[in-house]
Amino acid sequence: MKRIFKYLMMTVIAAGTMFYSCETMELEDLTDPNALSPDLADADLLLNTIQVNYLGAMQDMQYNGAALGRISHMGGRVYYENFGGGTVSGAWGALYSGILPDIDAIELQNGEENLLAFHLGISKAMAAHIMMGLVDSVGDIPFEQANNPTEYPNPATSDDEVVYAGALALLDEASSYLSAAVAVTDDLYYGGDTGNWMKFVNTLKMRAMLTTGDYAGALAMTGVIDTADADMQFSYGTQELQPDTRHPWYASDYTTSGAN
């Protein structure tokens, strides 16, 4: 009898504990800690991602150009068979899935003090460069309806001339931000040198003028990249342990124990 009573009491206590736990749990808290809202994102980390995405996009497009010009091995003799619908998928995804949403997230955090002017200046310049590269590669691309999935789940393409105008507008915004920017240490290309970033922006404007036939404007453009010290280069690191900051080809071939 005592044993039965003991088990009965244990059952009652366990049931009461479960009931109390259910009452105190936040069952309606559906926030995913692994999917933070844009306003909670770290602007410096967003900038890092934009810079790395830009690097990958430009490497993809530069390889395509090198292969077409036979500067690099194309892997075949027939152009049509080597360059299909996925040729610019890397740059396409970097722009629409990565860079543009990240720029929007940084803009949400940029207050009246304009403390993220440098972040926005260089990010918009890189976005404009990829936009022009995609137009040069495939022609019309989504722009006016892009990155608005609620209203345009399947965005239509915009005329290439409209996209180029949009890229030039982004470059104007980049110039405005950079002129008021305080350099940061998270610049993986120019090390926070706003002057060189302005030259980069002006060089892209000059290139756009050449592409669109504004030769007089291109000839009149000043403040462009015209010396080796203003050359735009991505600065890889030397760290082997994760995160491995070395060049991917170097990382795949060399370890502390020697060559692979």
Give residue spans per PLM region.
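Sec-dependent bacterial lipoprotein signal peptides
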Residues: 1-21
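Membrane-proximal, proline-rich intrinsically disordered regions
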Residues: 19-79, 86, 94, 101, ...
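Conserved, well-structured interaction surfaces
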Residues: 72-185
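TPR/TPR-like alpha-solenoid repeats
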Residues: 130, 137, 201, 208-209
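Acidic interhelical loop/turn segments
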Residues: 176-200
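Hydrophobic-face positions in mid-chain alpha helices that act as interaction patches
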Residues: 216-260
